[in-house]
Amino acid sequence: MKKALVTQAFGDKWHKVLELTKPRMEAYCERHKIDLISIEKPLVEPVQYSKLAIGNIIATKGYEQVTFLDCDILVANDCDEIGTLLEPDCTFMAFDEGSYLDRKPGLKGLADAFGYVPGWQPSFYYNTGVFVMTNKAVGALSQPPIGLFPNHFAEQTWMNLQLHLWSTATCSLDPAYNCMTSVEEHFGLDRYKDAQIIHYAGQSADINKLIETIKADDAKLKELGR
């Protein structure tokens, strides 16, 4: 199976973040024989929607499975190949943060604004900073109408709407593979010992502080042989 890991970073500040996190992504790809693709020029605004180009990458380069990681992520050096966790009938796998965070009302509001089925209620809300998808889920990467790109958690809420709209065969990723601060608190995880992937979601307000946090966590993981 032809596989790739895709990440993206835009602007000098985020390129500095990627400089810190990319070596671990490269090591992960080398261990698991996966191609690494880094999108570093924005294709649309908000820039986070650039990840929708994964559909084109799949179609033009023949990938059967793609793992996406935000650039503000540290991958432990003993991290399993995430794609092997994909259930047989599942075509899109991500962590369902809507199971414990109040995300679904915003998704419902977006659906109503775009004229989705009246009375519809969302059944999940995935964090799209880490996901695995196959070439059977490309429809979920559909773009919004030109000039109407919603900015509700960037592209995340729109992608969740598309996953519902296309009746994509989804499955939930273990929180250890998307260990955000809220995940640590809710599930009682230790980022250094339990996490396979540490995700610094929601910490971009102070990039310099984020960079120092990533440096410190990277050093701690190395100290633990991870």
Q: Where in the sequence are the language-model features?
A:
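N-terminal anchoring/stem segment of glycosyltransferases
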Residues: 1-64, 166-167, 201-226
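Short, flexible, basic/aromatic active-site loop/helix in glycosyltransferases
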Residues: 108-122
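Catalytic core and acceptor-binding pocket of nucleotide-sugar-dependent glycosyltransferases
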Residues: 123-210, 217
